[in-house]
Amino acid sequence: MEKQRKEYEELKQKLKQALHEKKVQEQEWDQIQQEIFDKETEYLSGNASSKYGTIVKGFDGFGKHASQDSHHFQDQDRIFSLSSALFVKQQEGVQDEE
């Protein structure tokens, strides 16, 4: 009986440790996805070097004067963020709360 109790306590401790590690990994994953989202927003919003186009939208304005607002983009332009189904689901949850 004592041996089973000891084994139970060891397994219980391993489970606690595994759950803690899982939580840490999920937090890191969320942070990485948020960083991707932020960098993607920064890139799609544009700066002086991207006024003629981006990899995502193309470079139609390269040979022209880019007088139009090139800083406008839609969520469908987010090819990296949208590639993560979990991140999309989380973002939809955030929008529902607002």
From Swiss-Prot:
<dbReference type="GO" id="GO:0035267">
    <property type="term" value="C:NuA4 histone acetyltransferase complex"/>
</dbReference>
<dbReference type="GO" id="GO:0005634">
    <property type="term" value="C:nucleus"/>
</dbReference>
<dbReference type="InterPro" id="IPR015418">
    <property type="entry name" value="Eaf6"/>
</dbReference>
<keyword id="KW-0234">DNA repair</keyword>
<dbReference type="Pfam" id="PF09340">
    <property type="entry name" value="NuA4"/>
</dbReference>
<comment type="subunit">
    <text>Component of the NuA4 histone acetyltransferase complex.</text>
</comment>
<comment type="function">
    <text>Component of the NuA4 histone acetyltransferase complex which is involved in transcriptional activation of selected genes principally by acetylation of nucleosomal histone H4 and H2A. The NuA4 complex is also involved in DNA repair.</text>
</comment>
<dbReference type="GO" id="GO:1990467">
    <property type="term" value="C:NuA3a histone acetyltransferase complex"/>
</dbReference>
<feature type="coiled-coil region">
    <location>
        <begin position="1"/>
        <end position="36"/>
    </location>
</feature>
<dbReference type="GO" id="GO:0006281">
    <property type="term" value="P:DNA repair"/>
</dbReference>
<keyword id="KW-0227">DNA damage</keyword>
<keyword id="KW-0539">Nucleus</keyword>
<keyword id="KW-0175">Coiled coil</keyword>
<dbReference type="GO" id="GO:1990468">
    <property type="term" value="C:NuA3b histone acetyltransferase complex"/>
</dbReference>
<keyword id="KW-0805">Transcription regulation</keyword>
<keyword id="KW-0156">Chromatin regulator</keyword>
<dbReference type="GO" id="GO:0006325">
    <property type="term" value="P:chromatin organization"/>
</dbReference>
<comment type="similarity">
    <text>Belongs to the EAF6 family.</text>
</comment>
<keyword id="KW-0804">Transcription</keyword>
<protein>
    <recommendedName>
        <fullName>Chromatin modification-related protein EAF6</fullName>
    </recommendedName>
</protein>
